[in-house]
Amino acid sequence: MDEFQRYGNKHKSWQQCFLYPLFFREDLYTIAHDLYLDKSSSSEPTELSISNFFSFPTVKRLIRRIRQQNDSNSIGLFRNCDPNRFINRNRNSYSELVLEGLTVILEVSLAMQSKHFIEGMDGWKSIRSIHCIFTLMEDKFPYSNYVSDIRVPYSIHPEILVRTFRRWIRDAPSLHLLRSILHEWRNSFSAENLQKALVPPRENRRFSLFLWNSYVYECESFLVSLLKQFYHSRSLLYGSFPDRTHFDKKIKHIIIFPVKISTKRIWLLKYPFIYYVRYGERSLIALKGTHLQVKRCRYHLFNFWQYYFHLWSQPYRVCILELSKIYFYFLGHFLSFKMKTLVVRTKMLDDLLISDIIANEFNPIAPIRSILLYLTKERFCDISGQPISRLSWTNLSDDDILDRFDRMCRNLFHYYSGSINKDSLYHIKYILLLSCAKTLACKHKSTIRLVREEPGSELFTKSFSKEREFIYSSFSKTRSQRERIWNSDILQINPLANSYTINK
């Protein structure tokens, strides 16, 4: 990728967004070939030469065929492509590789377009943790009284995306090629494919993610101007950089924080009376105002999606929640805001003033029942919560079994480090520890007691060891339940964060 950026700095065609000549560079498809093999299974041969598959005439013929086909054509070059059929050297695998090359061109080109804007700004700071969302919500959301829970609409016409790309792609051949491919992918934003794109990244195509990120970037860029008009503010500044993955920047009254974790993005936007958070297709807008103002904001959002993107958004995709009366599910946590009274004593000379301050307290709750159902689904325990052996892991070595259980317990405790029901997580730790012991006992055809007491056994000396007790120090029962620690090394979310159906 760096090589192509250096190449783009030397050639005016890339800098001026004339991308069509770049489609025929063989080194570009070498990168696409590597990306393609990364998505394939490990059992496939990797020693295949790129020269046996790519050449200028072949790519040119394929692109010409893409441009000449119409919607009634049954060729379907980019439809129902199986990424695991590379060895067959058929038309679908070839088209998939060409699509990977096209995606690389678009990503690098868009990155170079915003590079000059980023270099002109100072004070950027890298923050990679997903828990920065919860720290912002803990600090700022209690001052709001309403939250709009928004699901970004995913039904979009290909011509809307073509209009978006036309702003930074200047040559007509590239736009015609994109239009042909997008019409082949016109079902990519259906409900089923969207869930596949957001939940299991290994089954997702790179091009589909690029389309989704471009579409959401377009939505959010207009959302800022919409909020600016709604609050009659002229001091609101906005800068968006879809190619940057880790940074945090304050611009007067606004904070923008995009983070790419796996295949998703996180955006934080701060305004004196508005706080905006997004992960994937789920967005939260916290407002301080009356119920009428919140309904007006939702009305403007509906009009924006209807008139700009030419789509109708279902009313249930924008829910208005009153923070003091309801809790909601976001990123694997149940979030609630409860009223609390703070007693403030002020000493002024001989007078002692006592006043009560009523404020909202941020209470994130770990969904213990949902975690138990997840462990049941993964065969760590039965439906009643009793630990069972993980039979599929009995063919692994003892070290691998211990490391897997230890890693899962550590990640789970890290992710829910800021929840208020920390004591309930010890039950989850007990299930994982006993399931690990039963798995080792099943492997060695022994009992749990013998596995634990066997000389040289590393069940309680390596896994969950004292050397790693600092991992769970924030969950010590001697600590106050009011103390909340958010770990700053969370780079991927808990699997429950992608689940929208929660068992309460």
UniProtKB/Swiss-Prot annotation:
Protein's recorded name: Maturase K
Coiled-coil residues: none
InterPro entries attached to this UniProt entry: Domain_X, Maturase_MatK, Maturase_MatK_N
Example GO molecular function: RNA binding
GO biological process, one term: tRNA processing
Keyword Endoplasmic reticulum found: no
One Gene Ontology cellular component: chloroplast
Places the protein is found: Plastid, Chloroplast
Domain of life: Eukaryota
Function comment: Usually encoded in the trnK tRNA gene intron. Probably assists in splicing its own and other chloroplast group II introns.
Disulfide bond positions: none
Keywords, alphabetical: Chloroplast, mRNA processing, Plastid, RNA-binding, tRNA processing
Organism: Taxus baccata
UniProt family annotation: Belongs to the intron maturase 2 family. MatK subfamily.
